[in-house]
């Protein structure tokens, strides 16, 4: 069963630390494990409310950033996962390209639209 990797800020939570309720409801329809990915440092972790969300959170504290393929290589190694074990959605197009460059099936989520229909389709087709 594939693990769903979720971009933290602007996908699952706002920059004010509010959980995007509709996103949470959508994710809860899947029994798959979810891991929230972020680059947040300790201060940002609290600011964004990442210490209060219902899923495991992975961060490398901006070293490297998610726009660097090394971030995803290190994340996969940390969890002892293969690129084929996961699917991912992310709001930053450069981070999307970075994840794709290491072979992770990744969806660009346009956080300005907050439209979940296409994301649900991606999840349904790739889990």
Question: Which residue ranges define each predicted feature?
Answer:
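Short, structured coil segments at secondary-structure junctions
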Residues: 30, 51-53, 102-104
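Short amphipathic alpha-helix with an adjacent loop that forms part of the alpha/beta core around
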Residues: 73-78, 118-127
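Acidic, Mg2+-coordinating phosphoryl-transfer loop and its flanking beta/alpha structural elements
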Residues: 87-120
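Substrate-recognition "cap/lid" segment bordering the active-site pocket of phosphatases
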Residues: 42-84
């Amino acid at each position: 069963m594939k693990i769903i990797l979720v971009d933290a800020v602007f996908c699952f939570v706002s920059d004010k630390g509010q959980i995007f309720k509709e996103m949470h409801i959508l994710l809860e329809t899947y029994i798959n494990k979810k891991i929230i990915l972020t680059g947040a440092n300790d201060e940002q972790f609290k600011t964004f409310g990442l210490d209060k969300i219902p899923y495991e959170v992975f961060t490398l504290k901006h070293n490297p950033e998610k726009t660097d393929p090394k971030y995803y290589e290190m994340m996969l190694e940390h969890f002892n996962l293969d690129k084929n074990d996961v699917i991912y959605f992310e709001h930053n197009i450069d981070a999307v390209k970075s994840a794709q460059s290491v072979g992770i099936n990744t969806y660009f989520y346009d956080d300005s639209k907050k439209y979940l229909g296409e994301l649900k389709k991606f999840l349904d087709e790739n889990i």
